C-alpha cells in the first residue's frame, strides 16, 4: 500500500508560519472527489446536519462552518463564540460535549433527526469497527490521548504554496503534517510529548460540507512544533484505494504500544483523495486551574461514543508532536460527532511511557525529531526537531507546574455514562476560581529526573500539621513539672546545708579532711569583719506563747463592769457586746459619750487593757485615740472649770505590770534587781484574773502562728503612759518613777523590739525624769539601777541610747556612761555621782585601762584557756569599742565649759597615746580598723570642741601645752653655767677676731635677747639681800675680773699665730672627740669652783662678772662651735 507523508521543514523565522485552520478543500480536490465518489450528493445533506449539530453541542468558540475567506481574514485573531448567550465559554479550558437528549439545554431539529435515522446502518458499521479497534489495541479497549500534542489539520493547496514539504507518494492522495496555529492559548489541555492519540473511523458515504468555521489554535503551538521523543514512534498514516470498503481511520501516536503493533493495517485507513486534519490538543493550564472532566454523551442508539482525554505530567519534557492528516470528502471531520466518538475509545496506558521517558533521559545523544513511518514498509523517516528559544528561557519547571495541576479524565465507555448528569457551568467556573492547595513534597520530581508519577485522582486538602501537637504539649508539661520538682529539691537541700553548716565544719575539722598546709593558708587569708555587732544582742523579756494569758479582746466584756451610765450613749456602750462595742468605739460613740461627762475609772481601765491586747492595729489605735480624748477632756475641765468631778485616770504600777504580764513578760524579767522591787508580787496580780481556757488557748494559738509580738500594742501602752505622765506630773512618787524607769529600760532590751525606734521610749523616759522631785539624790540611784539591768556591755549601750536628749537625760547619760565604764573595767561600779555637774576629769583614770592589750590580758586571765586567742582578741576589741562609745556619750557637750578645757585636752592626749597607738591594724582583722577609725572620729570631735570653747579666764589666746608627764625638768642655772665656761681651761677654743667677724649680726641680737629675757625673769635671780652689801663688794668683783682678763690675754696671743686650717687638717675626728671630753671635764671643774666662789660673792657682782665673761669669751665659744661643725661635716 502506498502512502504519502508530508513533513514540515524548519523555517528560518522559527516556524512562526500562519497555519490554515480551515477544514475546507480546494476546487481541484473538490472536482476529483465529485468524480470519484458516487455517494457525494446523497450524503451531503446528512453531513451538513451532523456538523451543525456538532457545533451546537460542543459550543466551541467560532462555528465550524465558515467561509474560506472568513478564515483568512480572522487567521490571527482570537476565536469568539458563535453563541452570544454564553460568554463564559471564552474562559473555559476544556472541550465539553453536552448530551443531545438534554432538552433543557439544546433544541433539536426534526429534519436532522430524520436524516440521522436514515443513516443508522452506516453508524452501526462504524461502531462495530470501533469495537474491533479497541479489542486489538489494548486489553482495556482504550488508548491514552496525549494532551501535549500540538498539531493542526489544514488543507493542502494554500499550505503547500507557502511552505515547502517532502512528499512520499504511495497513492494519488497524500497526508500532510502541518504546523498548528500560534494564536490559541490555553484552549486545550497540555500533556507530555509521549502521549498517543489513536483514532479509528469508518468511512461514511455521507460527505460533510466544507466549513471554515473552525476555532483557531493557540499562538504558542508553533514553539512546540516537532517535539517528539527520539525513541517514540511517529504518527502512522495510510491510505486505502478509492474503491475500498467504506472505512477511514487515522492513527497518530508518539510511543510504541507493545499490545498494538504499528504494522497493523486496520489502524489507519483513509479513502482515496481524502484529507483529514487532526486538531492540536494542548494542556496549558496555570496553577490556579483545576482538573476538569469533560464528558460528551451521544445518541443512545450506539452510533456515537465518549471521548476520554487523559493527561500525564513530565518534569523533563519539552518536546511536542504535531501530526496533521487529510480525509476524503466522504470521511467525517475530526471535529464532528462521529470522530469524537471514535477518539474517545482510544487511551494510552501510563506505564507505556515510563520506559521511553527513562530511556530518553539517559540518552545523551537524543535529538528532538519527528519520526514518520509509512505503514507497509519498514522505513522510518526522522526529521530534526525544532525548539523555541522562549521555552528554553522559561525552563522545565514552567510546563511541569502547569501539567501537575491539570488532569482531565474522561470515560471511554459510552453506554455506562450516557445518563450521568454533566457538571454545570457554575461548578466549572468555581473550579477555576478555587485556590490550589500547596503541593506536597512528593508532588514534584527532582529537576531533570524523569520519574513516573501516578495521576492524582482529585485535588484534596492537605492535612494541616501544627508545630505544637498535643503530645509535645504533654511532654513540655511533664518536663516543666520535673524541673519544678528539681528546683524544690535543690532549695530544700540548700536550706539543709545552711542549717547543718556548723556541723559540717566541725566534722571536717575532726576528720581532718583538710591538710595542715591548706588549713594554714585558710587561717592566713581568712578575714574577720563581724566581730563588732551593730545591733545589741538583747534579752528575752516577753514570751509570745504567753500573750493574752490573763485576758484578751474576747474575754474583756464591758457588760461585766457595774457602772451607772449618765446618758444614752453610755448606756448603749455599756449594754453592747464586745464585738459591737469595738464597732461603736470606732464610730466615735465613746468620745461623744464621755466628752461632757466624766469617764468612770473602770471603763478607762477596760479601754487601756483592750488597747494592749487587741490584735487589730487599726482598732487598737482608735481605742487609743478615744483614751487620749477622754484624758484631755478631763484635764481641760479640771484646769479651766476647776471641776472636781473630772479626773484623769492614770494607770498604776500594778495596772502597768498586769498589762505587761498579759503580753507575755515574766515578773522576774521586769524586776530583776533585789534592791528595786514593787510593793506587790506576781501572785497578787494573778488573783485578780481567772482566764478562760478556751479564749486563752485561741489567743495563744494566734500568737504562735505569728511568732512575733504585736508592736502596736506596746506602742499604744507607752503612748498612753507618756500622756498620763505629762498631764499628771505628780501622779507617781520618785520610787514609782524609778520602778517605771527600770521597767521601761528593761523592755527596751527585748529581742523582738531590737529594730523598734526609740521615740516612744524616749518620750516616756523624758516625762519620768522630769517628774522626779529629788533629782540630786535620785540620780545616783538611777545610775546604780540602770547599770545593773544587764551584764552585757552592748545592752548597756542600748540603755544609754534610749535615754532622752533633755537636760536631765543628757546629765544622766554622762553619769551613767562613767558608771558603766567603771563597772566594765573594774567589774564593779566604783563611780558614784557626787553632784549634778559632770566633770571630764572623771574619765582620766579610765582611758589608760581601755587599751586593747590591757583588755585582752584581763579577759584571758578571767576566762583562762576557755577561748582561743583569736576569739579573745575579737572580744577585747569589741569591749574597747563599747567603752569608747560610752566615753563619747560622756563627753557629748555642745559647748564645753572653759574650766574643763584642760581636762578635754588631757583626754585627747591620753586617747591618742594609750588607745590609738596600741591598735595594730591588719588586713585579716578589719574590726581593729573599725576601732581605730572610731578613735580618730572621737579625737577629731574633741579637737573641734576645743576650738569652740572659750579660753581660760584672763587670757586672750590659749596655746597648746604638752601634758605634765611629757614636760622635762629644765634648770636655767645649769644653762648659764654651761655658757659661762672657764676661759683658762680651754685656751685653744678661744675665738679669733676673724671668726668673730664672720658671724652675722642677727644671731648676736637673738642671743642677746634670750640672755636678757633670762636675766629679767625674777625666778632665775635671787632677791637682793641688801643693796649696801652689793655696793661694797663691787670693787672686789672688778679686781677679780681684771685678773681674769690678764689670764685670757695669753691664749689670745697664742691663737693669733695659729694656723686654723692646717690644724684642722692634721687633727682627726677621734682627737677632736678626746679634746672635747677633756674640755667638758675642765668645764665641770671650773663650774664647781665657781659655785664655791658664788657662795661668798654677792648676786650683783656675780651677774656682772658673768656678763663680762660672756662678752669677752664670746668669740672663743663661737669658734669652738664652728670647729665642731666642720669636723662632723
From Swiss-Prot:
Start-end of Polar residues biased regions: 93-110, 169-178, 324-343
Subcellular location: Nucleus
Classification via Pfam families: CANIN
Composition bias, Acidic residues: 999-1014, 1033-1048
Record has DNA damage as a keyword: yes
One GO term (biological process): DNA repair
Domain of life assignment: Eukaryota
Composition bias, Basic residues: 72-87
Basic and acidic residues composition-biased segments: 112-130, 149-166
Keywords per UniProt: DNA damage, DNA repair, Nucleus
Region (Disordered): 71-178, 312-343, 955-1057
Signal peptide (from-to): none
Protein family (similarity comment): Belongs to the FAM178 family.
Function: Plays a role in the DNA damage response (DDR) pathway by regulating postreplication repair of UV-damaged DNA and genomic stability maintenance. Promotes the recruitment of the SMC5-SMC6 complex to DNA lesions.
Name of this protein: SMC5-SMC6 complex localization factor protein 2
Organism: Danio rerio
Amino acid at each position: 500500500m502506498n502512502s504519502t507523508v508530508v513533513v514540515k521543514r524548519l523555517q528560518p523565522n522559527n516556524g512562526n508560519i500562519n497555519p490554515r485552520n480551515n477544514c475546507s478543500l480546494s476546487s481541484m480536490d473538490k472536482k476529483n472527489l465529485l468524480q470519484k465518489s458516487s455517494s457525494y450528493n446523497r450524503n451531503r445533506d446528512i453531513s451538513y446536519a451532523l456538523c451543525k449539530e456538532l457545533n451546537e453541542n460542543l459550543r466551541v468558540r467560532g462555528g465550524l462552518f465558515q467561509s474560506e475567506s472568513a478564515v483568512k481574514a480572522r487567521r490571527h485573531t482570537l476565536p469568539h463564540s458563535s453563541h452570544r448567550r454564553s460568554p463564559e465559554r471564552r474562559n473555559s479550558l476544556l472541550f465539553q460535549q453536552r448530551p443531545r437528549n438534554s432538552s433543557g439545554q439544546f433544541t433539536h431539529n426534526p429534519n436532522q433527526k430524520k436524516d440521522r435515522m436514515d443513516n443508522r446502518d452506516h453508524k452501526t458499521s462504524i461502531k462495530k469497527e470501533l469495537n474491533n479497534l479497541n479489542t486489538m489495541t489494548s486489553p482495556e479497549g482504550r488508548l491514552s490521548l496525549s494532551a501535549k500534542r500540538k498539531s493542526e489539520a489544514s488543507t493542502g493547496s494554500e499550505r503547500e504554496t507557502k511552505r515547502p514539504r517532502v512528499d512520499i507518494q504511495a497513492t494519488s492522495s497524500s497526508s500532510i503534517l502541518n504546523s498548528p496555529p500560534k494564536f490559541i492559548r490555553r484552549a486545550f489541555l497540555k500533556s507530555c510529548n509521549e502521549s498517543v492519540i489513536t483514532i479509528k473511523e469508518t468511512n461514511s458515504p455521507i460527505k460533510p460540507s466544507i466549513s471554515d468555521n473552525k476555532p483557531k489554535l493557540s499562538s504558542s503551538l508553533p514553539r512546540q512544533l516537532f517535539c517528539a521523543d527520539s525513541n517514540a514512534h511517529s504518527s502512522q498514516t495510510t491510505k486505502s484505494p478509492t474503491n475500498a470498503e467504506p472505512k477511514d481511520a487515522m492513527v497518530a501516536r508518539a510511543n510504541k504500544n507493545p499490545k498494538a503493533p504499528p504494522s497493523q493495517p486496520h489502524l489507519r485507513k483513509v479513502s482515496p483523495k481524502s484529507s483529514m486534519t487532526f486538531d492540536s490538543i494542548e494542556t496549558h493550564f496555570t496553577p490556579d486551574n483545576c482538573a476538569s472532566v469533560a464528558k460528551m454523551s451521544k445518541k443512545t442508539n450506539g452510533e456515537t461514543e465518549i471521548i476520554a482525554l487523559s493527561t500525564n505530567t513530565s518534569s523533563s519534557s519539552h518536546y511536542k508532536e504535531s501530526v496533521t492528516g487529510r480525509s476524503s470528502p466522504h470521511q467525517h471531520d475530526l471535529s464532528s460527532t462521529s470522530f469524537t466518538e471514535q477518539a474517545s475509545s482510544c487511551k494510552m496506558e501510563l506505564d507505556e511511557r515510563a520506559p521511553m521517558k527513562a530511556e530518553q533521559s539517559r540518552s545523551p545523544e537524543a535529538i528532538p525529531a519527528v519520526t514518520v513511518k509509512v505503514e507497509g514498509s519498514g522505513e522510518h523517516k526522522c526529521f530534526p526537531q525544532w525548539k523555541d528559544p522562549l521555552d528554553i528561557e522559561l525552563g522545565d519547571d514552567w510546563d511541569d507546574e502547569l501539567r501537575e495541576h491539570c488532569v482531565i479524565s474522561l470515560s471511554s465507555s459510552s453506554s455506562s455514562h450516557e445518563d450521568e448528569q454533566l457538571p454545570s457551568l457554575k461548578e466549572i467556573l468555581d473550579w477555576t476560581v478555587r485556590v490550589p492547595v500547596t503541593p506536597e513534597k512528593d508532588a514534584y520530581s527532582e529537576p531533570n529526573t524523569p520519574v513516573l508519577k501516578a495521576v492524582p485522582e482529585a485535588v484534596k486538602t492537605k492535612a494541616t500539621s501544627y508545630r505544637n501537637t498535643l503530645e509535645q504539649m504533654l511532654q513540655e508539661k511533664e518536663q516543666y513539672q520535673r524541673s519544678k520538682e528539681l528546683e524544690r529539691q535543690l532549695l530544700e537541700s540548700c536550706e539543709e546545708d545552711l542549717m547543718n553548716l556548723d556541723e559540717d565544719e566541725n566534722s571536717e575539722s575532726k576528720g581532718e579532711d583538710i591538710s595542715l598546709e591548706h588549713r594554714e593558708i585558710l587561717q592566713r587569708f581568712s578575714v574577720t569583719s563581724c566581730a563588732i555587732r551593730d545591733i545589741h544582742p538583747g534579752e528575752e523579756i516577753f514570751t509570745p506563747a504567753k500573750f493574752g494569758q490573763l485576758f484578751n479582746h474576747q474575754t474583756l466584756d464591758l457588760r461585766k463592769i457595774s457602772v451607772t451610765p449618765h446618758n444614752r450613749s453610755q448606756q448603749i456602750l455599756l449594754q453592747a457586746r464586745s464585738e459591737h462595742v469595738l464597732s461603736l468605739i470606732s464610730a466615735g460613740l465613746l468620745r461623744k459619750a464621755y466628752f461632757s461627762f466624766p469617764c468612770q475609772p473602770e471603763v478607762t481601765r477596760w479601754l487601756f487593757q483592750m488597747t494592749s491586747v487587741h490584735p487589730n492595729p487599726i482598732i487598737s489605735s482608735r481605742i487609743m485615740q478615744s483614751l487620749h480624748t477622754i484624758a484631755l477632756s478631763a484635764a481641760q475641765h479640771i484646769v479651766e472649770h476647776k471641776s472636781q468631778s473630772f479626773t484623769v485616770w492614770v494607770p498604776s504600777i500594778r495596772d502597768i505590770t498586769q498589762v505587761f504580764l498579759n503580753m507575755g513578760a515574766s515578773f522576774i524579767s521586769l524586776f530583776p534587781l533585789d534592791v528595786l522591787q514593787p510593793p506587790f508580787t506576781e501572785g497578787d496580780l494573778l488573783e485578780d484574773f481567772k482566764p478562760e481556757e478556751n479564749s486563752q488557748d485561741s489567743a495563744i494559738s494566734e500568737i504562735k502562728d505569728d511568732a512575733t509580738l504585736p508592736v502596736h500594742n506596746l506602742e499604744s501602752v507607752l503612748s498612753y503612759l507618756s500622756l498620763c505622765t505629762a498631764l499628771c506630773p505628780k501622779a507617781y512618787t520618785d520610787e514609782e518613777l524609778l520602778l517605771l524607769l527600770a521597767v521601761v529600760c528593761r523592755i527596751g532590751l527585748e529581742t523582738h523590739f531590737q529594730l523598734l525606734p526609740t521615740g516612744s521610749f524616749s518620750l516616756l523616759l523624758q516625762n519620768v525624769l522630769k517628774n522626779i522631785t529629788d533629782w540630786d539624790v535620785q540620780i545616783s540611784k538611777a545610775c546604780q539601777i540602770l547599770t545593773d539591768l544587764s551584764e552585757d556591755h552592748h545592752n548597756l549601750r542600748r540603755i544609754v541610747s534610749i535615754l532622752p536628749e533633755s537636760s536631765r537625760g543628757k546629765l544622766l547619760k554622762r553619769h551613767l556612761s562613767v558608771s558603766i565604764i567603771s563597772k566594765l573595767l573594774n567589774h564593779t561600779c566604783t563611780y558614784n555621782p557626787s553632784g549634778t555637774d559632770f566633770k571630764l576629769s572623771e574619765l582620766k583614770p579610765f582611758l589608760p585601762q581601755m587599751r586593747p592589750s590591757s583588755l585582752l590580758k584581763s579577759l584571758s586571765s578571767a576566762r583562762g584557756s576557755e577561748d582561743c586567742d583569736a576569739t579573745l582578741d575579737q572580744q577585747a576589741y569589741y569591749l574597747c569599742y563599747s567603752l569608747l562609745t560610752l566615753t563619747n556619750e560622756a563627753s557629748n557637750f555642745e559647748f564645753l565649759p572653759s574650766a574643763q578645757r584642760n581636762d578635754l585636752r588631757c583626754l585627747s592626749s591620753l586617747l591618742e597615746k594609750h588607745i590609738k597607738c596600741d591598735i595594730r591594724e591588719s588586713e585579716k582583722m578589719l574590726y581593729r580598723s573599725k576601732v581605730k577609725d572610731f578613735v580618730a572620729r572621737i579625737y577629731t570631735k574633741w579637737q573641734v570642741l576645743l576650738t569652740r570653747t572659750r579660753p581660760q579666764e584672763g587670757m586672750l589666746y590659749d596655746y597648746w601645752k604638752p601634758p605634765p608627764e611629757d614636760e622635762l625638768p629644765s634648770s636655767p642655772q645649769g644653762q648659764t653655767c654651761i655658757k659661762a665656761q672657764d676661759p683658762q681651761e680651754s685656751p685653744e677654743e678661744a675665738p679669733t677676731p676673724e671668726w668673730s667677724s664672720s658671724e652675722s649680726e642677727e644671731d648676736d641680737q637673738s642671743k642677746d635677747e634670750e640672755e636678757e629675757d633670762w636675766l629679767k625673769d625674777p625666778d632665775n635671780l635671787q632677791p637682793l639681800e641688801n643693796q649696801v652689801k652689793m655696793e661694797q663688794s663691787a670693787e672686789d668683783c672688778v679686781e677679780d675680773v681684771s685678773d681674769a682678763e690678764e689670764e685670757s690675754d695669753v691664749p689670745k696671743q697664742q691663737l693669733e699665730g695659729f694656723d686654723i686650717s692646717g690644724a684642722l687638717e692634721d687633727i682627726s675626728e677621734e682627737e677632736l672627740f678626746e679634746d672635747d671630753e677633756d674640755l667638758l671635764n675642765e668645764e665641770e671643774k671650773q663650774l664647781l669652783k665657781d659655785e664655791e666662789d658664788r657662795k661668798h660673792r654677792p648676786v650683783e657682782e656675780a651677774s656682772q662678772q658673768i656678763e663680762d665673761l660672756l662678752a669677752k669669751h664670746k668669740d672663743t665659744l663661737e669658734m669652738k662651735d664652728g670647729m665642731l661643725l666642720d669636723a662632723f661635716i
